[in-house]
Amino acid sequence: MIHIDLDTLSKMAEDSFKAIDPRDLAFLFASGKSEGFMRDQLGLFLSRNLSLSGDEHVTREWKKHDLTVMNGNQPLILVEGKSWICHDAYRKSKLLTDKKSIFQGSMGDVKKLLDTHDQYPKSSIFISTIIYGVDTSMNRDFARFNITYGDSHNKGIQSAGNFSNLVGISRSHASTLHGAFGPTRRFPLRAGSFHGMNVEADFFLTQIISSPSKNLKNEISQSIFE
């Protein structure tokens, strides 16, 4: 029976994303969120490269889970995925306190996974997040290219002082948040540029081992902002 640990799944995710042309990744991130495409890319890679046997298979949207490795009707591995811009991870409100914050999105995925895990306790469960940014400061006319969330990218760069600061701080915030949920791996995505604007992105993968503490939001807030 297939078993994949955190390091193996992270390495397979990294290998699957390396197959994407950096110019294509830049286009995807500049023109909108792309968690669906990245989910499909990972799913295809797992389906091709896992040593599946018998009734084992990879599927999407089983019981509304993003990606699942199954043995017949039994889930073995479940993965949920989200995508956010750097400016979201940079700001305390969007990172933690808003009703539609990164934290709330992650918590919702964790609760859904734990509910399924209660029914299938032998399954391994994971959450993932892509954090990406477009350096709109490199092109004063960025609005001409209809960058999705272009104004938000620009506000984040201005707030952080420059694009490098924005990427670094948002990466640190996302690392702390993910690490609070469980063992975490991170790797950069090889994104190129879009009409002269550099694109940066990171992939975070966390294995959920236990239920989050009731005070987790405050613990994350204290770790980052206090």
Model-derived regions: residue spans:
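Catalytic cores of nucleic-acid endonucleases
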Residues: 83-144
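Acidic-basic catalytic patches of nuclease active cores, encompassing PD-(D/E)XK
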Residues: 1-58
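Non-catalytic C-terminal interaction segments of nucleic acid-processing enzymes
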Residues: 140-226
